Each structure stands twice: as structure tokens, then as C-alpha cells.
């Protein structure tokens, strides 16, 4: 573990309000233990056929497997996004459930394929996979090769010990003097460095950033009081908090801060499939099945109200 007092670090000012959040946080999360059903037999949430989406599938379109929507999902050790069920072979999680909704809407069977992160770009480009649904962030570089339909916000979360007196971390003043665990070289570290600069300029004490090599050590530091909070990807922290009840969320920031970062279904560029996928997503958003999936996996705060095709991506 390495500790750095960020008063010694110079960080260029960003031309945005340092206290402005891009995500509307519903407030501190309730402390409750959730028992997730990780059985392979658990029924996925389903959606009705969406005739409008089906009609948008290009005439003669060749799916990777006839009659099936073949989706690559990577990182099956990343709950609640993707993990293996209790049979050690079935992919479950919010990503597979989202894929099921799209497959149902398009009148297709779902075929989930476990893929490495390095494999999916070639797999999608070659037609091995119809799409990848694996926490892929829209970037301008990726938009040159792929089409996107958004389905979640990229969200970072502040989590504290469940009994902590800290109720909210929403802006730079809220981190003043706190000890916060963060990953080195990450966008969340960039957020904290910028907020520390704002605090120093306002005469407030900066936060002390702490770096741990593994999550278990980080959680122990929070529970023992050596750290006040963790700041990282919301999904994994939300899952841990729900399982143990030992931590709770007190604030969120968009993962692309100070820009907007979106998570999207990814397809080969220009093959025409992204339009029916977008229509399918909008249908399940309006129909409520999408919300059911997010609630099942504790990801309500990452919800979107409208899917977008190829929105502005993070810069190259």
C-alpha cells in the first residue's frame, strides 16, 4: 500500500465546475444485506417481441448463428455485471440479462459466449459475435470501428462503512480532510486530484489518497477506520455492499468526469443491426423490464431514461 498526500501534486485546472456531478444520485443507499440468486436455473427477466425492432433488421441480415442473437460477454469474475452461476459454466449478471431482453425483443434465442476483453473487437468485426455487451464505454476511437446503443451510465461511487457519520460526498468540499482509497492512474483518481486542487485554493484541507493492491485490504481499511471511503466503479462496490451490508453508497460521479461516459451495446459499424437493437432497448426501458434487470442486480443508480445511438464518446 502506498499513501500520497495530494497537496504535493500539481494538477491542471479543468474548465468545468469542480463540484458539478454528471449523475443524479438518489441519495445515500440504505444498508441492507441482499441474497443474490446465483443458480443456473434462475429464470431470466424476459421481454415481449418488439415488432418495430424486428422490422428494422436489415433484409437478408446474417446473424452469427441463424435464429440466435450471439453476444460476447467478458470478465465473468466481475459481479454483478458478469459472473458464473453455481454450475461454473452459465454466464449470469446484468449484462447477460440485458442481452436476454434484446434477444426477446428481436424474436431471437439468446446465445451468450464468454469472451476475453482482448477478443471481442475482432470477434464483432469478423461477425463471430453479433454484439458485445460487456461494460464497453463509448469512445471516439471506438466509434470509428463500431456502432453503439447506450444502456447504462458509467458511474463511479463513494462507499463508506455502514456506521460512518459521513452522509454525502457530492462535491469537492465533501472530501476535505478525508482518507479515500482510489485506484492509481484511474479517472476516479483524476476527479479526486481536481477536487483537492479546488479545496486547496479555497483554503480547505485536501483529502489523503490511499492506494491498495487488492479489494480485500481496501475493505479491511474502511472497516477498521484507517480509511474513510473508497471511490471506484459503482457496480462492483454496490454488489459488495449488498452482499455484506458493511458499506453504503454516499455519492456518485459519472465515470467520464468531467465529460459524460456511456456504456453501450456494441456492433460492427455500418451493418445495420444497431438500429433494431436501439429500438429494442427503448422498448424495454419504456416497458419496465430494463428497470427490473437493474434492480435485480442493485444497479438502479446507473439507469438511463433513453437509449442513444452513437452519442459523443470520450476523446481519443
Q: Can you name each region flagged by the protein language model?
A:
Residues 37-53, 187-202, 282-316:
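Ligand-binding clefts/hinges and TM-proximal coupling segments of bilobed small-molecule sensing domains
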Residues 153-160, 242-282, 299-316:
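Periplasmic-binding protein-like
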Residues 72-78, 113-118, 127-139, 161-162, ...:
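Beta->alpha turn/N-cap motifs
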Residues 162-180:
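Flexible hinge/capping segments at coil-to-helix
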Residues 27-135:
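Extracytoplasmic small-molecule ligand-binding "clamshell" domains
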Residues 119, 136-143, 191-195, 200, ...:
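A ligand-binding cleft/hinge motif common to bilobed small-molecule-binding domains
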Residues 84-86, 99-106, 188-211, 241-245:
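Ligand-binding cleft/hinge of the Venus flytrap
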Residues 101-105, 113-114, 118-131, 145, ...:
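Short helices/loops that flank or line small-molecule/ion binding pockets
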